[in-house]
Amino acid sequence: MGKKKKTEETAQPKKTSRSDVKERKELNKDTEFTCVKTSFNSLVENNYLSGGIQEIVLNINKICFLSYQLLNYHFTRLIEENKPLPEITQSLFYQACATVSVMKERKEKIDETDELYISFSHYKEHVGELPFRDRMGNLINNLNRQQLTMTENHLKLNFYKRFHKYLEIKTGETRKGVIYKWLKDIYAIEYSGKNFFILSMRQWLKYPPSEVNIKMHSSHFVKIYHKILKTFEKYPYSKHIRTFNLLPTKNSFTLSTIEICSSCLKDIIGYFTKTQVPDDFKENKLVYWYEFFKIEKYETKTRKFANTIYTDGKIAVIRLRKPKFEAPKPKDVKKTQYEQYVGIDPGVRSLQTSCNNEGRVLETTTPSYRNDCKMKYACRKREMWYKKWEHYEMWRNIPSFKTTNLQKMRDYFEYVYPNLNTIFQFHLYKNFRGLSFRSYCRGKATMDKLCKSIVDDKKTLVGFGDFSQQHGLVKKHPIAPIQKFKHELRRYCDVVIIDEYNTSKTCNKCFQPIELYKNKIIRKKRDGTHSKARMSIINSVIRCKLNECKLCCMDRDINASKNILFLLQLQKEGKKRPECFNPKNMNDCDTPLWEDKYVVA
């Protein structure tokens, strides 16, 4: 048969729904899911099965790594050659995974005219032995679903910040208030103004860059990202400008988890036995699950196994199903009597600084939390393993893949791909995954100890500052688990979110503005000598501007926690916040662009 002409009308196939999927969706309406994280060895006692799953995890991670980079190269090539981009769907990711893998047990047909295969052929000779996908179809489907989600999040969540920086570079405008006003007009559904710059940007973007539009027109916004990235590459030595990938990539060579569902279990059994799985697998799938995995000890009367396990060969996450309960009504804290009131100021340098109504102050610094969680130990261990590795110099000199230059991408492939198996094998046999699991276990214990020290076996009401931490707020500074801490604290006491406005800038004694403390500081140089004493500002210490105030100097975080405690007590009594803690309406800065700042995208 010849190919059908484009003019021929083809009947669209009717969309069918599987009975098991329909049944599962109905069941999910009345249930919710929870997870239990454990070591993989405690779940699987069969060494043959454990070793086989290790091999499968490694193979799927290779496919994930190669497919992500293929799509980045493919989209960049199509944009450079002015060819239309394919829609970003799960089928596209499956096609990419099929391109970078092979079938060992049967022959496969390869369409050498396909654009994706043409992109892969540009650097295929550097890859070496490709991973296999025999009896891996369902595992790859689960991987593709995750890849699609990661790509949508990558495009949606990063656009505002990168577009903000793009406007700053193109116009030279550094006032954030002005750029915010532009973005507000650019993001608006309808714009009735006559600002030439806003109109040109809206015309270039074509669609308002909301999350819904970015998801709906993802291929179009990849072109926008390409333009932004090309602009960023012109400033390689600017610290505040960071390059990025058009699409997400697997940034680490450490093995990631794979999702094993019932269909995947059927494939795994066929992979081990090299025979057809019995036809009664669907009816007896739970028998196979309980035979291969020790799941019974994690089930209870209400929590039952949900036919899914996530594993990277070192840890295992078991998904359990439980009945859906009605959400409890929010408690009226004004009518409840408490034994203790606590104000908590979360932050970056300190995970939390708390002060209760008796004046007891507790502070947990981020370095001390990371030390208790064995995170610092894990960092030192990883660094030691890398430095003792015989291929350390090769590893250290891996070039960047964050570029729009196709030749630089091919140079990356030529450098990395011949050593790909060596790198993955090193991360497989060294205990990188075990270090992460140890930090997770120690983190749970540390968080439990911290919450108990704050509550102190009393009925407690906590006022928690509404600090919304952004990743990268302080360059190269580790992030603090503020949201995790807040959710964990709700298990021990009642938590009320308090607006932090001006709590760090107002004296807790007289409610007057404060200023940063100044003093002479002697700094130690790298060569061991000391500099001359010089007047400097100490950011962590404040003093009240009012000379009559009793507050001489105090830690800035402790002052903020006392103000949060005061606002909590006012809210408990139903009183209004003082004027010094009320946000004032900022005047809109409608500064027009100068003529030399008119930029065509």
Positions of PLM-derived features:
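Positively charged, helix-rich recognition surfaces that bind polyanionic ligands
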Residues: 2-81, 87-97, 101-127, 132-150, ...
